[in-house]
């Protein structure tokens, strides 16, 4: 049974690279809080009726990012939500503003080796359909890590602990910091 103390918490947004565990950790966190959980990538697919790889193929990354910003604006306007975002959400200034000003942002920092382990066979990740996925992950982290850090209220390292433990850790950090 979620605590009354949780009622005062703002929305919680999970950011980080692909393979960080945002969706898995987010589901556990929402369960702990008794809140709705959404994944922005899944929501984009639901609303468009198209897969992310298809959107990337037909509209390119710019088209996808435009759709992502519209969906993020809507989702971050809701209440009592735990939201897992796509890995590139922070590349758009409007998205960073929505996240930072409309809730508590938690960056799930994940080393490239662990990202690769978790995403190696996933064909639904258009940015990894390259000859050297490990190098692509390194390049993306180099570009995006400063943006994740800029938008984050809290940083959690995901290389230790199961998803449920990470969700509990996030909750403890938010409650102890007074981010609510």
From Swiss-Prot:
Cellular component, GO, one term: cytosol
Subcellular location: Cytoplasm
The gene coding this protein: aroK
Domain of life: Bacteria
Classification via Pfam families: SKI (PF01202)
PROSITE patterns documented for this protein: SHIKIMATE_KINASE (PS01128)
HAMAP family linked to this entry: Shikimate_kinase (MF_00109)
PANTHER family named in the record: SHIKIMATE KINASE, SHIKIMATE KINASE 1, CHLOROPLASTIC
Function: Catalyzes the specific phosphorylation of the 3-hydroxyl group of shikimic acid using ATP as a cosubstrate.
Gene Ontology molecular-function annotations: ATP binding; magnesium ion binding; shikimate kinase activity
UniProt keyword list: Amino-acid biosynthesis, Aromatic amino acid biosynthesis, ATP-binding, Cytoplasm, Kinase, Magnesium, Metal-binding, Nucleotide-binding, Transferase
Binding site for ATP: 19-24, 125
InterPro entries, sorted: P-loop_NTPase, Shikimate/glucono_kinase, Shikimate_kinase/TSH1, Shikimate_kinase_CS
EC number: 2.7.1.71
Assigned protein family: Belongs to the shikimate kinase family.
Named cofactor requirement(s): Mg(2+)
Amino acids binding Mg(2+): 23
Protein name: Shikimate kinase
């Amino acid at each position: 049974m979620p605590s009354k103390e949780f009622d005062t918490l703002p929305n919680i947004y999970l950011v980080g690279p692909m393979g960080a565990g945002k969706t898995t950790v987010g589901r556990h966190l929402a369960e702990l809080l008794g809140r709705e959980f959404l994944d922005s990538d899944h929501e984009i697919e639901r609303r468009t009726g198209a897969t992310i790889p298809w959107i990337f193929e037909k509209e390119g990354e710019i088209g996808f990012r435009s759709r992502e910003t519209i969906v993020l604006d809507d989702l971050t306007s809701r209440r009592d939500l735990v939201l897992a975002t796509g890995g590139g959400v922070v590349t758009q200034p409007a998205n960073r503003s929505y996240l930072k000003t409309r809730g508590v942002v938690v960056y799930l920092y994940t080393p490239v080796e662990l990202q690769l382990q978790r995403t190696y066979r996933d064909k639904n990740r258009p940015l990894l359909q390259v000859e050297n996925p490990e190098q692509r992950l390194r390049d993306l982290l180099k570009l995006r890590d400063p943006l994740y850090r800029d938008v984050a209220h809290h940083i959690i390292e995901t290389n230790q602990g199961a998803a449920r433990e990470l969700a509990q850790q996030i909750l403890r950090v938010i409650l102890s910091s007074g981010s609510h």
